[in-house]
Amino acid sequence: MTDGEKTLAEYVYSASGNPVVKKIGGNITSTYAYDELLNIKALKTETEKQTLADNHYFYDGNGNQIRREGLEGTTGYAYDGRNRLTEISYPSALGGYTEKLGYDAAGNRIRRETEQEITTYRYDNCNRLQELRREYKNTETSTAQPEMIRYTYDRQGNMLR
C-alpha cells in the first residue's frame, strides 16, 4: 500500500492466505507463525533497534486459546463445556487481575466481573442487548455511580443506541 510516493505498508502472505510478514512505514515489522491448524502460534513485532512485542500462543484440543506468553508475562484463558470464554488471568505487568465471564442458556454474555467492577447484560426475546449495567465494587475510593446504558432497535433490528 502506498500513498503515491512511498510505501506505507507491505504484506507477505503464506500459500494458505495468512499474513506472515507485515511492514509498516518501513521501520516496523511484524512476523507471524502458524501451527498445522492455521492458529497463530507466534507474533513478533520489532523495529531495527527494539522488540515491541514477542507473543507465543497455545491452544486446547478444541482450538481455544488457553495461554499467551509475551514480554509482559503470561495471560491465561479458561472455557466452559460449550467453549465459551469464562476467565482471563492477566499478568502483573498488565495489572495482575482476573476477569470472569458468565452466560445465559442462549450463549449471551450476562456477567463480567473483575476485582474493581461488575458488569451485567440484559437481552430481549430476540437475544438483542437491551441494557448494560456497570457497578463499581470499591465505593470507598470510587465516587462513581453505577453506569447504565439502554439500547434500542429499529424495526429491521438495527441498533439505534
Show the residue positions of the predicted features.
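Beta-strand elements of repeat-based all-beta scaffolds
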Residues: M1-D3, T7-I24, I28-E69, T74-S92, ...
